[in-house]
């Protein structure tokens, strides 16, 4: 979004061209680089800069619910773009997705992904160093994965509806400050 305070304008979007083809937004879409199914539903999208990237490049990572559904386009055939599930609870896998976005080239590409327990709604993903913490909200689980996408530990909660988000923070020098 450009001019966020004076008159916001959407400068570009990441989305499936086929979904947006009959709208005025299609010209705003970045080009998908590579062969992968675009995210279907997404939660906790995180913008990440990196000193190794060129100006105009950044990462976006997210919990990809892997669901094809839209209240504004109930007739859209999501299976035509690889999203075969439209149920909040009956899917097999959701995914952790990480894109490299290049504003200069007008592209986005999938640079990392792995399957996680399915959750059609809610949920979260957080990079913690080399690891990734994933909350599959409708399953009531959260798992920390190592750099090779192997589960380190999984927790399951008794819950009535779902776990909305899970985050991991260090509180060094915050609550437990050393006193001299």
Report residues per predicted region:
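Histidine-/acidic-rich catalytic cores in large beta-rich domains
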Residues: 1-180
């Amino acid at each position: 979004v450009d001019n966020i305070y004076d008159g916001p304008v959407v400068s570009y979007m990441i989305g499936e061209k086929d979904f947006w083809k009959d709208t005025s937004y299609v010209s705003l879409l970045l080009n998908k680089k590579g062969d992968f199914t675009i995210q279907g539903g997404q939660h906790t999208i995180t913008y990440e800069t990196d000193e190794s990237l060129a100006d105009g490049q950044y990462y976006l990572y997210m919990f990809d619910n892997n669901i094809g559904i839209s209240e504004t386009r109930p007739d859209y055939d999501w299976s035509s773009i690889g999203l075969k599930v439209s149920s909040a609870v009956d899917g097999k896998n959701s995914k952790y997705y990480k894109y490299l976005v290049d504003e200069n080239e007008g592209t986005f590409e999938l640079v990392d992904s792995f399957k996680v327990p399915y959750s059609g709604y809610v949920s979260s993903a957080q990079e913690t160093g080399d690891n990734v913490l994933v909350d599959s909200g409708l399953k009531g689980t959260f798992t920390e994965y190592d750099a090779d996408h192997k589960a380190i530990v999984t927790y399951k909660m008794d819950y009535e509806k779902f776990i909305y988000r899970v985050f991991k923070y260090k509180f060094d020098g915050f609550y437990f400050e050393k006193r001299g």
